[in-house]
Amino acid sequence: MKYIFVSGAPGSKWSSVVKNIYYSPDVDSSDYSEARTYRHDATGTMELLHMGVYWGPAMEFGDWFERLDQRTKEECEAEFDAPFSGSGVRIIKSHVFGYHIDYIKKTWPDCPIVLVDRTDDACLGWWVKCGEFKITYPLYRDYYKDLREMSAAIARENRGNRQAARDYLGRVVETNRQLARVCGIQVPAPEYYQDYVASDIKVTVI
């Protein structure tokens, strides 16, 4: 298994899901840099919300990912691997993966896909609370344009992820420890424990 794919709309709290498996000893974290972080006090305390590379239109990598299924496996993997220099399983996360779940499943059948879901309204509300277009990493303005387009995009992305969870009979997990085990990686240290139910997040692995 080379990759763990993560798909979630803006505001789905998918970054917290990624963060709390990112510290598994089996994960390649060489895509991390201080420039690829974002901190905010939306949770009530200033903390790290975004870390590592985000792939997608108008982002640092994956600008063409809306058309992911029109590229070869080799082209996709070159873009996945570009920010990494280490070893281990690589977490590849993109908001637009929800449009391409069938292609990802067919092309990388041995790699888990993690689908992160909250209601459309909850996603938009949380994304706004976290800074909306003032979020400094990743940058959203060039692709999502304005709140109306962001709201529509969240609905589209969530719809794709929910359909995939139904189509592939996904397994719902309730903590990051369960997620790590289902994905076949070592469980991170106890300080990274996350209860998805308490966090109002639905996490499904297909």
Named regions from a protein language model:
Residues 74-82, 99-102:
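A generic local structural motif
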Residues 85-187, 203:
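PAPS-dependent sulfotransferase catalytic domain
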Residues 1-79, 181, 189, 193-206:
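PAPS-dependent sulfotransferase catalytic core
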